């Protein structure tokens, strides 16, 4: 599924359109539509932990989100070997409106509540 990026991805401001592809129930791959060398592994944060935040009104307007919108929230993960060393960016979620194919990266102000590089091993069941 293709998405127009309405709010730039930090460090990748030239990425204007991405494709999203499901890997499994927890992971997805996001790739730039115009540069195959730019891709990210995304994870469903709700598969790992409790995760909540408010989407600012300005972002809701850009993505045309209302109470009936179908949205998908994913976080960028840096996959490591072993997988327990994988880190997740919880303060920069990607927001996807699947009704109109618009996306944005949000930088949360609650940075003390979530980390930029939290080890996935903190949330895996042992």
UniProtKB/Swiss-Prot annotation:
It holds the Pfam family FliW. GO terms for biological process: bacterial-type flagellum assembly; regulation of translation. It is found in: Cytoplasm. SUPFAM superfamilies: BH3618-like. Keywords: Bacterial flagellum biogenesis, Chaperone, Cytoplasm, Translation regulation. It comes from the Bacteria. InterPro entries: Flagellar_assembly_factor_FliW (IPR003775), Flagellar_assmbl_FliW_dom_sf (IPR024046). Acts as an anti-CsrA protein, binds CsrA and prevents it from repressing translation of its target genes, one of which is flagellin. Binds to flagellin and participates in the assembly of the flagellum. Belongs to the FliW family. PANTHER family: FLAGELLAR ASSEMBLY FACTOR FLIW. Interacts with translational regulator CsrA and flagellin(s). This is Flagellar assembly factor FliW. It comes from Sulfurimonas denitrificans (strain ATCC 33889 / DSM 1251) (Thiomicrospira denitrificans (strain ATCC 33889 / DSM 1251)). The lineage of its organism: Bacteria, Pseudomonadati, Campylobacterota, Epsilonproteobacteria, Campylobacterales. The gene is fliW.
């Amino acid at each position: 599924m293709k998405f127009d990026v309405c709010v730039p991805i930090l460090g990748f401001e030239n990425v204007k359109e991405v494709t999203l592809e499901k890997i499994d129930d927890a992971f997805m791959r996001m790739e730039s539509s115009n540069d195959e060398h730019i891709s990210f592994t995304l994870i469903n944060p709700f598969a790992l932990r409790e995760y909540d935040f408010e989407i600012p009104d300005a972002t809701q307007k850009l993505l045309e989100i209302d109470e009936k919108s179908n949205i998908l929230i994913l976080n960028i993960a840096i996959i490591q070997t072993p997988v327990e060393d994988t880190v997740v960016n919880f303060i920069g979620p990607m927001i996807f409106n699947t009704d109109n194919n618009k996306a944005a990266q949000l930088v949360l102000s609650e940075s003390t509540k979530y980390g930029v590089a939290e080890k996935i091993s903190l949330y895996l069941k042992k």
